[in-house]
Swiss-Prot record:
It is found in: Secreted; Lysosome. InterPro entries: Interferon-induced_GILT. Disruption phenotype: Mice lacking GILT are deficient in generating major histocompatibility complex class-II-restricted CD4(+) T-cell responses to protein antigens that contain disulfide bonds. Mice are partially protected from Listeria monocytogenes infection, they exhibit reduced bacterial replication in spleen and liver. Bacterial escape from the phagosome is impaired in the macrophages of these mice. Its main location: secreted. Residues 27-54, 231-248 form a propeptide. This is Gamma-interferon-inducible lysosomal thiol reductase. Coiled coil: none annotated. One of its GO terms (molecular function) is disulfide oxidoreductase activity. Lysosomal thiol reductase that can reduce protein disulfide bonds. May facilitate the complete unfolding of proteins destined for lysosomal degradation. Plays an important role in antigen processing. Facilitates the generation of MHC class II-restricted epitodes from disulfide bond-containing antigen by the endocytic reduction of disulfide bonds. Also facilitates MHC class I-restricted recognition of exogenous antigens containing disulfide bonds by CD8+ T-cells or crosspresentation. Both precursor form and mature form have thiol reductase activity. Its EC number is 1.8.-.-.
Length: 248
């Protein structure tokens, strides 16, 4: 699978959208400031108006995946990332890189066998370390950046330079090849094995803890489940299409 045809589109989005402030948030802040200065002046008796409704919790989206699964990469780059760009203010993402791997305890040390070989195990650990060491948004964007590329391991440095320049690729690789990487992968194995119902394939997507059978419906489901009074404009027009998965 070649990912280069979407690189220009993705790179532009990655550079522009993380810096955007959701319009709803900007509008509410400016409105509050305006109302505060015009309706309640000094020395006036200011009555309390209606209390604002508590903010609705974001929709929780959890992705259980493996780094070299083509279907996982497609979902991450073409579905999850664009959905986050469009409705980031109403969703919360959790990534669990492990997928269809298996673990065993050998003389007190955890060893892993991955569906797509040793490289996938190493990349799973790299992404687990990114999630462990970076701020959540920076980790997500760095992983998306890597997953879009053909040679993911070599793209760790360039992607970090864009989204977490204060973190060296050497520190991430030290984590991935050391005890911390093994521990993180074991924790991801436990999270994956504890799924109920168990995952049938990857990408395995949970939305508010419930399996999403058709990953292409992610944007639609997030919009439907969000209970806030104001939703992003994109929620009014959505199209779905079927996607393939990688079975065990």
């Amino acid at each position: 699978m070649s990912w280069s045809p979407i690189l220009p589109f993705l790179s532009l989005l990655l550079l522009l959208f993380p810096l955007e402030v959701p319009r709803a948030a900007t509008a509410s802040l400016s409105q509050a400031s305006s109302e505060g200065t015009t309706t309640c002046k000094a020395h006036d008796v200011c009555l309390l108006g209606p209390r604002p409704l508590p903010p609705s919790p974001p929709v929780r989206v959890s992705l259980y995946y493996e780094s070299l699964c083509g279907a996982c990469r497609y979902f991450l780059v073409r579905d999850l990332f664009p959905t986050w760009l469009m409705v980031m203010e109403i969703m919360n993402i959790t990534l669990v890189p492990y997928g269809n791997a298996q673990e065993r305890n050998v003389s007190g040390t955890w060893e892993f066998t991955c569906q797509h070989g040793e490289l996938e195990c190493r990349l799973n650990m790299v992404e687990a370390c990114l999630l462990d060491k970076l701020e959540k948004e920076a980790a997500f964007l760095t992983i998306v950046c890597m997953e879009e590329m053909d040679d993911m391991e070599k793209k760790l440095g360039p992607c970090l330079q864009v989204y977490a320049p204060e973190v060296s690729p050497e520190s991430i690789m030290e984590c991935a090849t050391g005890k911390r990487g093994t521990q993180l992968m074991h924790e991801n194995a436990q999270l994956t094995d504890a799924l109920h119902p168990p995952h049938e394939y990857v990408p395995w997507v949970l939305v508010n803890e419930k399996p999403l059978k058709d990953p292409s419906e992610l944007l639609s489901i997030v919009c439907q489940l969000y209970q806030g009074t104001e939703k992003p404009d994109i929620c009014s027009s959505i199209a779905d299409s079927p996607r393939k998965v990688c079975y065990k």
